[in-house]
Amino acid sequence: MIWHVQNENFILDSTRIFMKAFHLLLFDGSLIFPECILIFGLILLLMIDSTSDQKDIPWLYFISSTSLVMSITALLFRWREEPMISFSGNFQTNNFNEIFQFLILLCSTLCIPLSVEYIECTEMAITEFLLFVLTATLGGMFLCGANDLITIFVAPECFSLCSYLLSGYTKKDVRSNEATMKYLLMGGASSSILVHGFSWLYGSSGGEIELQEIVNGLINTQMYNSPGISIALIFITVGIGFKLSPAPSHQWTPDVYEGSPTPVVAFLSVTSKVAASASATRIFDIPFYFSSNEWHLLLEILAILSMILGNLIAITQTSMKRMLAYSSIGQIGYVIIGIIVGDSNDGYASMITYMLFYISMNLGTFACIVLFGLRTGTDNIRDYAGLYTKDPFLALSLALCLLSLGGLPPLAGFFGKLYLFWCGWQAGLYFLVLIGLLTSVVSIYYYLKIIKLLMIGRNQEITPHVRNYRRSPFRSNNSIELSMIVCVIASTIPGISMNPIIAIAQDTLF
């Protein structure tokens, strides 16, 4: 009799849980329609991989790219809709979150054609690679819309686990295995630090997990200026710092950049920063609203260290990917200026604008590196000497992307930095802006040093790698060149038409 009653209770509880889940999916599912498209693409890839003996490779790329483009389209159709909170407060939809989701989808859409020839040359498993990229994209999108501590922790873990697997995708490469191990160990440590900070925030607010409810809880418990909040701030800053990779949380970045497959590095170099920036703005601005002076000071220190160390150490590098790793550390210092300025003085608008340009500049540079690496088998900066004599198009594309990264006019990078520094100056961050200007000049030096190597025309200085340079026989090299052309155009043309881009960025609601 007791067993019968317990069994009935179990069935009733299971039915209630199922009905609640169905209700959430039915009424809130439309708010995550772009994410649902990616999930459908993932399921389709798995079905094709498990049912087909001979994998139709073009179809796999087509399904992945189409799901990303359709997800972008769904986001654009939803633009300007009223902000909504769904899934019992776990997820928030507004223009601010959606523009970061758009940037992540844009990165992934450009990275897939960039990876085609590399995967064919290295004979890596194609389906798993695409699954990891789409799953990481999905995790990044959920992180952008996360509205509670649990989702903010689980979503980046979804992204991070796929990142670890992608960085170690070339299993026979010793450098790749070493990079993966460092990435995994430091990522696990940073996640534990982050969740420890969340526990302090959870306890201080009286057991709240939603971001806005945490603020209300801190007011009710009178804990908004307590030492516990300062401890939470320090731990959370360290945890998020690993994802953004500013100095001194940058130790993993050069090794992962150098050891991982180049298309993977291109993907991680932009998507991780976009997703982490979206999360950082919400965490610092909402739960730590009463500690703005403290987190401003912490971020200013990180920005200064990143801009100085990143650009100075980049000068000494001999590997192109390690140089870009330290360059990215310097670039995140500029982005942090926008986070500090905040919603006032167009800080977030300038950060979003600069990140859009940074995506095109960085991916364009990596597309050139992928092509050069496949045709020569080297990553050494000195081996680029004389590339202009063999492949003027590739050399000019790389030069334009590097000049845009350095911030030379009239390229997009110049206008992005100008807008970002102007907003910082208007907010009174004079010292940060001056450091940013000086380190930008330093970055121009090492970018110009590479461009000078590219344009060498004397035979005695041309390296054997360039002398024996051959175009790839693979049919898919057009896909890399397509990504490269799109990124090069986006790195140059938007600088002339900044106003529409700034207007869209300013239209985001936080």
UniProtKB/Swiss-Prot annotation:
It is a multi-pass membrane protein. Its EC number is 7.1.1.-. The chain crosses the membrane at residues 24-44, 57-77, 99-119, 124-144, 149-169, 183-203, 227-247, 295-315, 323-343, 354-374, 395-415, 418-438, 484-504. InterPro entries: NADH-Q_OxRdtase_suN/2 (IPR010096), ND/Mrp_TM (IPR001750), Ndh2_N (IPR045693). One of its GO terms (molecular function) is NADH dehydrogenase (ubiquinone) activity. It is found in: Plastid, Chloroplast thylakoid membrane. Keywords: Chloroplast, Membrane, NAD, NADP, Plastid, Plastoquinone, Quinone, Thylakoid, Translocase, Transmembrane, Transmembrane helix, Transport. One of its GO terms (cellular component) is chloroplast thylakoid membrane. One of its GO terms (biological process) is ATP synthesis coupled electron transport. It catalyses: a plastoquinone + NADH + (n+1) H(+)(in) = a plastoquinol + NAD(+) + n H(+)(out); a plastoquinone + NADPH + (n+1) H(+)(in) = a plastoquinol + NADP(+) + n H(+)(out). The keyword Transport applies. It is an enzyme of class 7 (translocase). NDH shuttles electrons from NAD(P)H:plastoquinone, via FMN and iron-sulfur (Fe-S) centers, to quinones in the photosynthetic chain and possibly in a chloroplast respiratory chain. The immediate electron acceptor for the enzyme in this species is believed to be plastoquinone. Couples the redox reaction to proton translocation, and thus conserves the redox energy in a proton gradient. Belongs to the complex I subunit 2 family. NDH is composed of at least 16 different subunits, 5 of which are encoded in the nucleus. NCBIfam families: NDH_I_N (TIGR01770), PRK02504.1 (NF002701). This is NAD(P)H-quinone oxidoreductase subunit 2 A, chloroplastic. It comes from Panax ginseng (Korean ginseng).
